[in-house]
């Protein structure tokens, strides 16, 4: 796909090798309309697509998009998963094709020490996860601020990507819905790289 070819070019041009990782939900319909929606009738296991937005204390029916962006807010990798998937499951689905020594900042939902150690040992990628208060691995204050700075960048990007999406994505099949999400991300990537 052209998105991935452009992404590899952007990764090569990103000399800082600093990235941010986060996910955002894309609802197919409101919860109240699940039984009447034509698209949801074609989804076999509906519970896989029922997710929760913890920050808003709200459930949704749709997909969750995992996105990795550069410091300049260019998306370079993404994965579209059912809404019930956790952030760690999304991390497992990403290709993580980055240069050695790359740093990927993520929020506390990606806390998994085995993943951090594996990526550092095998791929030489440093996964910078924001630590919870009860974490076994404690960060220095400077590292905590650095992770927060990198993490806030992706929140801005996700807001900009969601502005690209229409209020409702019209699709008749699940594959068409996912294709439209991928095309919106590609359009955002082109807009961010060449127009803005």
Give a label for each model feature:
Residues 1-196:
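Short alpha-helical elements
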């Amino acid at each position: 796909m052209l998105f991935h070819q452009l992404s590899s070019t952007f990764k090569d041009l990103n000399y800082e090798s600093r990235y941010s990782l986060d996910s955002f939900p894309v609802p197919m319909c409101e919860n109240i309309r699940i039984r009447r929606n034509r698209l949801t009738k074609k989804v076999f296991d509906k519970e896989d697509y029922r997710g929760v937005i913890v920050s808003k204390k709200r459930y949704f029916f749709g997909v969750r998009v995992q996105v990795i962006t550069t410091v300049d807010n260019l998306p370079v990798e993404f994965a579209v998963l059912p809404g019930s998937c956790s952030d760690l499951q999304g991390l497992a689905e990403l290709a993580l094709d980055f240069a050695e020594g790359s740093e990927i900042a993520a929020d506390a939902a990606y806390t998994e020490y085995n993943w951090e150690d594996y990526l550092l040992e095998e791929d030489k990628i440093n996964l910078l996860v924001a630590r919870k208060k009860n974490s076994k691995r404690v960060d220095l204050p400077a590292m905590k601020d650095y992770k927060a700075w990198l993490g806030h960048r992706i929140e801005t990007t996700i807001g900009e990507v969601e502005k690209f999406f229409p209020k409702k994505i019209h699709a008749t099949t699940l594959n068409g819905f996912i294709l439209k999400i991928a095309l919106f991300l590609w359009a955002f990537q082109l807009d961010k790289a060449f127009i803005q």
